[in-house]
Every structure is written in C-alpha cells, then in structure tokens.
Regions:
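Phosphate-group recognition and catalysis centered on beta-loop-alpha active-site segments
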Residues: 1-273
Length: 273
C-alpha cells in the first residue's frame, strides 16, 4: 500500500501544468522548493535514443517548434523553447532530459517521482516503445531512485513489461477502472499499488468513454483499499469539495495542476505540514 509521510501526498502534475512551463526544470525547481511530495512527469524518446520530458506526441503545443518527438533528434529538441507559453516573463528553456530531472532530484531525496511512459507499443511501434521503457528503467536504476519511483502508464503492456523485468524494484501506477489499461497478461491488482481514478465506462464496442462528471463513485474506493491499492485523485476534479470527499473515502494522494494552491488548502485543513 502507498504510504504518505503527510496525511495527503501532493504530486505536482507535470511540475504544475497551469502556468505555461509544464515539464520544465524551472517548474520542477519551483514545486520542489514549495514542498510538494512527488513530481509527476512524462517521458518520450527522441529519434536518436535520448529521453526527453514531454507529454504530447508532438512538441507543437508546449514549444515553439513542430513535429513528433520520436522523429526529432536531441539536437533538434534542444533548439526548442519549452517556456514560450509561460504566464510570467522568463528566459528561453529547452525541454529537459530525464537525467536533468534525476540530477535535480538528488537535491531533494525525499521527493517521490512519478514517471509516465508516453511511448506506447501500438502496432508498428512496439520495438520503439519497449526500447524506450527499458532505457527509462535503466536510467532510474543508474541513479538509484527505484524505491521512490512510480512507473506510470496508460498502457498495461508497458506496465507489465517493466514489472516482468524489474519486479518490485519499482512501485507501479495504473488507471482505474482497469480496462483503461487495455489488454494485459497480468492482473494489475497483483502489482499496481497506486490507481489514478478515472470516471469512465466501456461501451459495447470496447471504446473507453468519459462520464461528464469526473468524480468517481464512493463504492469504487474501498475495494481498492482492501487490496492495498491507493486511489489517486487526478487534476480533473478541479473543485476542492470533491477532493475533500475523496480524502474522506480513503485517498491520500492527489495529482494537481496547482500544487501551491493545493498545499495551501491541505494545510488549512490540517492534512499537510
């Protein structure tokens, strides 16, 4: 079972998504300094095998460039400005590498890492995705951060690939209901210890569809807790009363786009120091 040092663990989603500098070193430094418990970020691999922190398949939304990450070289990525949309004036900043975050994390040994694997083993992309996943894990092991790292993916195939090779050296973050993860050989309840709660259903065609109301029903929480799986609350809830309700149902971890505001709210509630 996931255990928080605080009554509620605050994870900074992409380092704090709402300020135009998501997944940058500036964002990560800011939220680590303010006292978050966990950094959530996204990793993709460039055409020449470097691990870059980028959420989207392309660089178009978050930088001044265009193109798929996996089609660009590191040299091309490093010419981009990932702070171009910042809500405050700041110097240009290239998208960081995973190793840059891991170097920064050495300064904050108590901060947990939530690493989302964004290259998926879709048809024709299997080799690339598994190569990327292995490279990420090898680097995490190299930096000795396994025990404070959660392997996170919407792809059940990626999660079980990592688990089969590295086992319990890492922690694992899945998505609930489990059908979101797609086809898997393993039962995620056998190794996943954090589940991001998504209010979704699967129609007769197997398509996963979101409910308009992002809050999952209370009856979803206790069965997970009984199996040692901690429900994680996603940024989509947006309203503090909904988060507070989830905390009362047993969740003790929140992934937020506004970590400073969330920390202030939790401190006011006596749920964080």
């Amino acid at each position: 079972m996931f255990e928080a040092k605080e009554k509620v663990c605050v994870s900074a989603h992409r380092g704090g998504r709402n300020h135009g500098i998501e997944n940058t070193l500036t964002a990560f430094r800011n939220v680590m300094a303010m006292g978050v418990d966990m950094i959530e970020t996204d990793v993709r691999m460039t055409a020449d095998g470097f691990l870059v922190l980028m959420h989207d398949e392309t660089v178009d939304r978050t930088t001044d460039g265009t193109g798929r990450v996996q089609d660009l070289t590191l040299a091309e990525v490093q010419k981009l400005n990932a702070a171009v949309h910042s809500d405050k004036p700041m110097a240009p900043e290239a998208p960081p590498l995973l190793k840059d975050l891991l170097e920064l994390a050495r300064e904050y040994p108590d901060v947990m890492l939530n690493i989302e694997f964004k290259d998926y083993p879709t048809e024709g992309n299997e080799e690339f995705a598994y190569t990327c996943a292995a490279a990420i894990c090898d680097m995490l092991v190299e930096y000795g951060v396994e025990k404070r790292t959660w392997i996170n993916s919407f792809s059940g195939k990626i999660l079980e690939f990592v688990y089969k090779k590295w086992g319990e050296r890492f922690h694992y973050h899945g998505f609930y209901p489990w059908f979101i993860l797609g086809d898997m050989e393993l039962d995620p309840e056998c190794f996943v210890d954090v589940a991001c709660m998504q209010h979704r259903y699967q129609n007769a065609d197997g398509e996963v569809i979101k409910y308009e109301e992002p809050m999952c029903p209370q009856e979803w929480f206790q069965p997970l807790l009984d199996k040692g799986i901690m429900p994680l609350m996603a940024p989509s809830l947006q309203e503090y009363p909904k988060y507070d309700k989830a905390f009362s149902w047993g969740s003790c971890i929140v992934n937020t786009d506004e970590p400073e505001d969330m920390l202030a709210h939790l401190r006011e509630m006596g749920l964080h120091t």
